[in-house]
Amino acid sequence: MKQLTLGMVAHVDAGKTTLSESLLYTTGTIKHQGRVDHKDTFLDYNTQERERGITIFSKVSSLDYKNNHFTFIDTPGHADFSGEMERALSVLDYAIVIINGLDGVQAHTKTIWNLLEHYHVPAFIFVNKMDLTHYTKEELLDSLSQLSPHIMDMSASEEDIAALDEEMIEEYLETGSLKDTSIAKAISNRHLYPLYFGSALKNQGVDELLDALDRYTLEKEPQTELSAQVFKITRDERGERLVFIKVTGGRLHVRDTIHDEKIHQIRLYQGNRYTLVEEASQNDIVALTGIKKLQAGDYIGLGHVIHSTLRPSMLYSIQPSKEADINHFFSSLKVLGEEEPLLHLKLFDDHAQVSLMGEVQIDILKQLMKDRFNEDITVDEGEVAYLETIKEPVEGVGHFEPLRHYSEVHLYFCLLYTSPSPRDGATS
């Protein structure tokens, strides 16, 4: 059975969670198809998510379709929670990019696309809400072309599809047709981004998308040596620390030791429910308990640390209430700082400083501190997070002394410095 990890990514209100719900319902994984506006979807079970109608935290679910086991990570679509989305990208085999057919490509869509390029994630595209849009498929495809010229409506002719990849061109010229494996290879190499249209709410186009995921995806070669990537730290309802990983090679077992810490449990999550398993093998997405040292972006065995490319633009000072215990205030923030590393938490004598993306994230931070730790906090108006760097090329001379001889090294640092161009009467 082919086993893959797929990520649901989109700008806010594109219908990403609705598509996740439709995929689970269509395959018989869930019996009731919830709706975001009814506040009863399978994956948005957090109270704040249901009240706001947006995804705040990434969720894991899985389904079986034909000879495939697909694990889906439903990620936040709101720009304020882009860090949570980016961390999931490091463990994806493929992304499903959902576009709102009413809007086309949005600014955050471009951010997502750039991140997919950074992490080398191949993608399928699903244009949603086609039952409501006044745009034609051709107009929407024209909008999508600003992301890549390799996006192709899969209802096009095989000749048009083949034109996007040299190997497919050769095959088509020789045989007059294309094999599914050839199309799958082009997608995996990011020479082709298949495009589908439909309505997730009405389950239109969902069967076609599932069929494409079956026919046009490839599984990575088996790896025997242990390797795993950490992409999420969170806590369960009892406060148990959960380390979400994707096993990319070998096997992990309960009671195995990682950095002198023993794995207590291996949990296989389906929404907010989980099953305890004794081991996890390649391509499994699981949560570990008993592990305190690993952080988001870390790895187990073979691999490398993943660093976020995103940087929040604002710094905020956070004050506890007058009645608060300062140590409890700090320890509570440390928990949230583990779960969202982009907070870049700094602690001072009587307050803390965090980096945040926007107003919605501020509101959620306040609510999390109240709901989870019974802490009332005050957040100031914030200031721009400036980054300091050199303006001009400089030459530095450094010396190092190997065992047998004296050496001198000249280092030349060069940074292109530019100032903003005048715009709307402003001066740089």
Where are these regions (language model features)?
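P-loop NTPase catalytic nucleotide-binding module
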Residues: 1-14, 32-33, 101-237, 257-258, ...
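P-loop NTPase switch module centered on the Walker A-proximal segment
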Residues: 1-91, 95-99, 105, 139, ...
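Active-site phosphate-binding and catalytic loops of NTP-dependent enzymes
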Residues: 30-36, 43-57, 150-154, 216-225, ...
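Conserved nucleotide-binding/hydrolysis modules and their immediate coupling elements
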Residues: 216, 224-315
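C-terminal effector modules of nucleic-acid-centric enzymes and ribosome-associated factors
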Residues: 272-393
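C-terminal polymerase-core module
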Residues: 383-419
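Single conserved hydrophobic/aromatic residue that forms the stacking wall/gate
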Residues: 417-428
